[in-house]
Amino acid sequence: KYFERFVPLSGNGLPPDNVQLDPCAGAAERTSPTNIGMYLMSCVSARELGLIDPGEMRARLRETLRTLHSLPKWHGLLYNWYDTRTLYPLRPAYVSSVDCGNLLAALLVARSASPEEDAGRFQSLIDEMELERLYDEERGLFRIGYDAEKDAPGQSHYDLLASEARILSYVAMAERGIPVRHWEKLGRPCARVRGGCALYSWSGTMFEYMMPFLFMPSATKTLLGVSARG
């Protein structure tokens, strides 16, 4: 119902970042790569669950696909925020590594759920996403992002396995040739939890532990699986 109301089929296929109900301010006129990716995932999931028919799913995916091809990008990577009315990046223009990783994962899902012609257009977006430009080869880690206003890479890095950035790491190795040794560089500090062991994240949030499971579930008795339950 949320997407039926706030992403109408007659629009540009971009979901709002949020909707404020009290006090009522309506839908935010901005969106991000993660918002777009989760909307694509929701369309495919709704079709799988029988909430919408295949025709509506295809129509929604095509609408978003058309807009994605038209958005200004940095080496094929979306900026972190766009005005949903003008389709221009919001300033300061910044490219977020983790958000681009989330979008790439969702594009792969949308591609697999689409007919051949649409799948090819999704693939062209995937091929253009130069995630390797956000990778620090010396550290073997992804930078937080890239400041397009200053034309400068971020100085901080994603360096923990228990992080939402795990999606970025996985799809970048699979699709963009990032070396597998990058996975070994991700830190695995542990805490004792109820007689077992759980990975530390930066802030202990459900977002960090659970979001990667949308794309890459882990077996129950692995360190990642135990950490998510702990």
Predicted features along the sequence, with ranges:
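Low-complexity, Ser/Thr/Pro/Gly-enriched N-terminal "stalk/linker" regions
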Residues: 1-27, 140
